[in-house]
């Protein structure tokens, strides 16, 4: 395999990468003979890195196939590669499995946390000699499966907070139900079993996390949404249509969109939203994974999910940077109560971990048929998530860590209840102490 002269080739590209993006490219190229997973937050420009590498490899004479999970994301990547002077087109995994294509040298895979799915594994078996380069913001699966079966190296980019501080992502205000007991904590494996329960399950049980839709969605948006361009994520198509109708009946231009609509109709609706003709666009997850919607400044989350990937993908739809912008996230599902804050520092790894959910099919079954008001709790209001990095609770946190049991866990929850939603600062004494004593803070 030839050595890539990426410095000379890269200068001729239309796409110009930032320094942090170029560092990720360099790290991929240093391991270009191995399968690499590139991890960087939503909105950090992974698609640009993918398009950059695609042309770089293609110009060196390699056959490169590019894959993305949805038609909308494929179209975005096609446009980006075209803009960069490439004639390559993205492929659908299933159609490629059934097709008769030449064996590629490289597979570039967007939203690569899907790599353990059966269809992707069939693709990898079809092209056993191809080198894989995957891209993901959240390399964690709900079923707990790792990605080490598909990738050899994990290459991690900047944190969310670093990207915010460098004006790559927008800063934000986050509103969550007042019932939330806040950020959860986990313990490394040797501390997991306590009275027959894992700490993760104990935290979830003690925190009061339930699959509900809290507060009045319309009223909250009017009070806290600041009349911003908004994407609403609903638990089902029926619910999405119902929310769009409710907003429209109250004088707010809102539309529903889903994958069953004609392509021309979807494009027209998205175009109207981008032009500002539609204020609120409602969907289930069409405008979620990998979708670039830089016009959105507010996100409404009404879909409870145990999937960290889904939570992060949806929350970040409002985080694209624009000067003077502050994104607003209205978390009616209290997903922050289960997953933690969106700018927490993750310790990503290729290996698997314990499944996040006891009932992984819950959303597909219950929420898919959802048509009842029984899961609404409009007696609760959303409150702004307040961060506290001043070490006020360090001694109590130290005590809880030393206990290392359910009693200690309850102390943590009591602390968080007092402070509403409080996270421990990355550089605080408590953070360092917790890591040293085997705690992962925040939980992934």
Model-derived features: positions:
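Conserved pre-motif I regulatory segment
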Residues: 3-37
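Walker A/P-loop
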Residues: 33-52
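Inter-Walker segment of RecA-like/P-loop motor cores
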Residues: 67, 71-103
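A short beta-strand element within the Helicase C-terminal
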Residues: 279-283, 289-304, 310, 317, ...
């Amino acid at each position: 395999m030839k050595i890539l002269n990426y410095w000379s080739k890269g200068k001729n590209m239309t796409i110009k990468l930032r320094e942090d993006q170029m560092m990720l490219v360099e790290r991929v190229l240093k391991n270009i003979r191995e399968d690499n997973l590139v991890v960087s937050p939503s909105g950090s420009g992974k698609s640009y890195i993918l398009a950059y590498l695609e042309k770089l490899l293609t110009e060196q004479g390699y056959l490169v196939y590019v894959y993305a999970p949805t038609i909308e994301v494929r179209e975005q990547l096609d446009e980006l590669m075209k803009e960069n002077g490439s004639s390559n087109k993205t492929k659908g995994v299933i159609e490629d499995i059934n097709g008769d294509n030449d064996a590629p040298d490289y597979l570039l895979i967007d939203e690569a946390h899907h790599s353990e799915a059966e269809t992707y594994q069939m693709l990898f078996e079809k092209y056993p000699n191809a080198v894989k380069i995957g891209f993901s913001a959240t390399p964690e699966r709900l079923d707990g499966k790792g990605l080490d079966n598909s990738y050899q190296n994990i290459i991690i980019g900047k944190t969310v907070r670093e990207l915010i501080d460098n004006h790559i992502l927008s800063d934000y205000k986050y509103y969550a139900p007042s019932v939330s007991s806040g950020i959860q904590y986990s313990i490394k494996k040797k501390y997991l079993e306590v009275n027959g329960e894992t700490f993760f399950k104990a935290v979830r049980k003690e925190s009061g996390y339930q699959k509900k839709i809290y507060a009045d969605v319309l009223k909250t948006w009017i009070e806290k949404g600041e009349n911003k361009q908004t994407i609403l994520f609903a638990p089902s198509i029926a619910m999405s249509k119902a929310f769009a109708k409710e907003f429209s009946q109250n004088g707010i231009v809102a539309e529903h969109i889903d994958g069953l609509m004609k392509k021309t109709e979807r494009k027209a609706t998205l175009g109207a939203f981008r032009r500002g003709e539609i204020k609120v666009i409602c969907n289930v997850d069409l405008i979620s994974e990998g979708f670039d919607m830089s016009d959105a400044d507010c996100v409404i989350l009404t879909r409870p999910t145990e999937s960290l990937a889904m939570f992060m993908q949806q929350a970040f739809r409002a985080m694209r940077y624009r000067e003077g912008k502050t994104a607003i996230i209205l978390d009616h599902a209290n997903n922050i109560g289960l997953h933690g804050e969106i700018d927490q520092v993750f310790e990503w790894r290729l290996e698997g971990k314990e499944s996040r959910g006891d009932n992984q099919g819950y959303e597909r079954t219950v929420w898919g048929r959802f048509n009842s008001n029984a899961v609404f709790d409009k007696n609760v209001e959303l409150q702004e998530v307040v961060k506290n990095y001043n070490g006020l609770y360090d001694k109590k946190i130290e005590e809880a860590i030393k206990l290392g049991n359910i009693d200690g866990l309850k102390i943590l929850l009591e602390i968080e209840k007092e402070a509403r939603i409080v996270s421990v600062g990355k550089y605080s004494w408590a953070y360092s102490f917790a890591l040293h004593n085997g705690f992962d803070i925040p939980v992934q």
